[in-house]
Amino acid sequence: MDQSNRYANLNLTEKDLIAGGRHVLCAYIMKPKAGFGNFLQTAAHFAAESSTGTNVEVSTTDDFTRGVDALVYEIDEAKQLMKIAYPIDLFDRNIIDGRAMIASFLTLTIGNNQGMGDVEYAKMYDFYVPPAYLKLFDGPSTTIKDLWRVLGRPVVDGGFIVGTIIKPKLGLRPQPFANACYDFWLGGDFIKNDEPQGNQVFAPFKETVRLVNDAMRRAQDKTGQPKLFSFNITADDHHEMVARGEYILETFADNADHIAFLVDGYVAGPAAVTTARRRFPKQYLHYHRAGHGAVTSPQAKRGYTAFVLSKMARLQGASGIHTGTMGFGKMEGEAADRAMAYMITEDSADGPYFHQEWLGMNPTTPIISGGMNALRMPGFFKNLGHSNLIMTAGGGAFGHIDGGAAGAKSLRQAEQCWKEGADPVAFAKEHREFARAFESFPHDADALYPNWRGQLGLAAA
């Protein structure tokens, strides 16, 4: 059935839709399946399925219903581009406080339309949120400024937070885990649970929390510097998440503001993120995106992009989210990922298709991880243009030839190298931990700095 007369209006302009302030706009790359309707007909069916329609006309439809139809307002068949305007009144609101929910946004914009028989594939690349709808989202309650404050740094341009993930990701018992934390904290700032770490039978949660608390206090006494830890509180059950969070805060007591809560936001979903955001508004909310590649990977033709995921995370209230390494690490990514970093940190930013004003909503910190080490960091900072972020290097710290503390120091020295605009190999001659990173990661050293062996001489022997 051709629904383009009802669910498409190509006379609408994006400028007028934005000025009207009553529509969420979404940009998709879509390909119709052969043997069905043309591009516009398929796009209109997509809009119908995403809002008020189905595959047939129904007798219960009235004029009001038609007034909240989603509408295709722009297509470019050559680029497989379609843009759809969704009236904000379509989206569900909480009955307790009238707030918006990402679950409803996803259900409409990327829900049943992903399984339509006449669509070969469709993937969301960007979306725009008007002020009236934006104001209904929680947004972050804490930011990197809160972490900088704990660390005793300026709250403007407080700089690089040197972090790690304790490796191996699974298999360490509580005491060896805490020992690794102590070792890293002698040189670094921030440690996070890896996403599967929790309450394994060989590493009971409460015992691990107590020992990490002890390790943090000893490291702070030894270095005279505050330390940070991000605990995984992800669970299927809301009550389990709250129980974990409350136990952690009770245990760390006067160091409670040194604690972030990590939530596996993709696998556990918006409900888990909102549970952490609302029950623990004073804690830094660390959004881990494990599993997201199933839909965000460039190889995936359905779903949505990592850019879209990150933008949704800011709306939900994530204080920080993993944003990849812009092609400088081991995970999929590209230099264009910096647009994602700007979208979640700035108050006014351009996406692939839409400009977004955030109206003062708190920013979300880019958290960088995935195959990073000190040798890759100067180029990463140069591409991004600043170092106001958290970086969690697992192998990049504990793979250092002199151990976790030296690995942490090498990462901090990498930021110093970039800030000074120094040649990394020349810089290494005066900074032992950074120099030893060349020996620790020789494959990267050969690829990035081909003549390093001769230039460093005995330092690289």
Curated annotation (Swiss-Prot):
Residues holding substrate: N112, K169, R289, H322, S369
Coiled-coil stretches: none
Any one GO BP annotation for this protein: reductive pentose-phosphate cycle
SUPFAM superfamilies noted in UniProt: RuBisCo, C-terminal domain (SSF51649), RuBisCO, large subunit, small (N-terminal) domain (SSF54966)
UniProt-listed Gene3D superfamilies: Ribulose bisphosphate carboxylase, large subunit, C-terminal domain (3.20.20.110), RuBisCO large subunit, N-terminal domain (3.30.70.150)
Superkingdom of this protein's organism: Bacteria
Swiss-Prot/TrEMBL catalytic activity: 2 (2R)-3-phosphoglycerate + 2 H(+) = D-ribulose 1,5-bisphosphate + CO2 + H2O; D-ribulose 1,5-bisphosphate + O2 = 2-phosphoglycolate + (2R)-3-phosphoglycerate + 2 H(+)
Entry's EC annotation: 4.1.1.39
Residues annotated for Mg(2+) binding in this entry: K192, D194, E195
InterPro entries the UniProt entry points to: RuBisCO, RuBisCo_large_chain_AS, RuBisCO_lsu_C, RuBisCO_lsu_C_sf, RuBisCO_lsu_fd_N, RuBisCO_lsu_N_sf, RuBisCO_lsuII
Subunit structure as annotated in this protein's UniProt entry: Homodimer.
Function recorded in the entry: RuBisCO catalyzes two reactions: the carboxylation of D-ribulose 1,5-bisphosphate, the primary event in carbon dioxide fixation, as well as the oxidative fragmentation of the pentose substrate. Both reactions occur simultaneously and in competition at the same active site.
Family (UniProt): Belongs to the RuBisCO large chain family. Type II subfamily.
Miscellaneous information on this protein: The basic functional RuBisCO is composed of a large chain homodimer in a 'head-to-tail' conformation. In contrast to form I RuBisCO, the form II RuBisCO are composed solely of large subunits.
Name of this chain's protein: Ribulose bisphosphate carboxylase
UniProt lineage: Bacteria, Pseudomonadati, Pseudomonadota, Alphaproteobacteria, Hyphomicrobiales
Gene that encodes the chain: cbbM
